[in-house]
């Protein structure tokens, strides 16, 4: 965005892609996924305008990391820097693709950062009412499809004038009240309107890390276009977050003709062509005993 603002005559392509792989039988295994999303940024967008208003909240925490360490050859009995498994350097690097993490601690960090960033953004916008009511849909990072709806309950209560006083963290029953709220008909209706459209693709793809939020945006727009609903002039709220921990909040407004862009995206049609594999094949792929070349693949470019 800054590049295009500084060079309005130019356009930029942003590519978000990643692979979310976790250990077999770990609590993160079911969230695995992979994919990519490409976005075209220009001064005259045909889909959505993004204002230069962002709020960011950060705090240094150690909730997630991918193991990477070095071991000196002399420490494992290799003298004179002899070659070992093709390694010529005096140190051997050990790296593991699957992360070490504490899921519940991460969730606590995410809620803390997103809540702080959300209310910073509300202050930035000088919004006197309920901020999320001004958003047609809420687009959040989805490591699994229901993550956003489960995280957002605290913000939902805190920004609601009738609920804020009843939901105080100092209250010993705060979390039990919050759990009950998340199961209420009122909150379920809110989720169906604000989050469910983004969850459609996530439930079929899984976690894509950096690409996840923008896949949620595409899923939301494809869902509404499928229903024939005109979103011209409507605002989407974006809440990005991640381990480490950080959150960013911003808005996007749909421009006239947005549906013509979305009509070209065969998102759900493509996902319907996905092929199931048996558990044995999955385990072989995960352990790299078998490569993806031996499994039927589907590529999608739009």
Residues covered by each model-derived region:
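Claisen-condensing/thiolase-fold acyl-transfer catalytic domains that form or cleave C-C bonds
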Residues: 1-6, 29, 132, 136-302
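Acyl-CoA/ACP chain-elongation machinery
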Residues: 2, 10, 15-17, 58-73, ...
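Flexible, glycine-rich active-site loops centered on histidine and acidic residues
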Residues: 5-39, 44
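Active-site-adjacent bridging/hinge elements
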Residues: 12-14, 84-94, 186-192
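Short, structured patches in soluble enzyme cores that scaffold and shape functional sites
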Residues: 16-18, 42, 52-54, 142, ...
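Flexible glycine/proline-enriched surface loops and loop-helix/loop-strand junctions
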Residues: 22-24, 93-103, 131, 196-199
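Condensing-enzyme catalytic core mediating Claisen C-C bond formation in acyl metabolism
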Residues: 28-119, 245-302
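Short, well-ordered amphipathic alpha-helical segments that serve as non-catalytic structural scaffolds
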Residues: 110-126, 216-220, 224
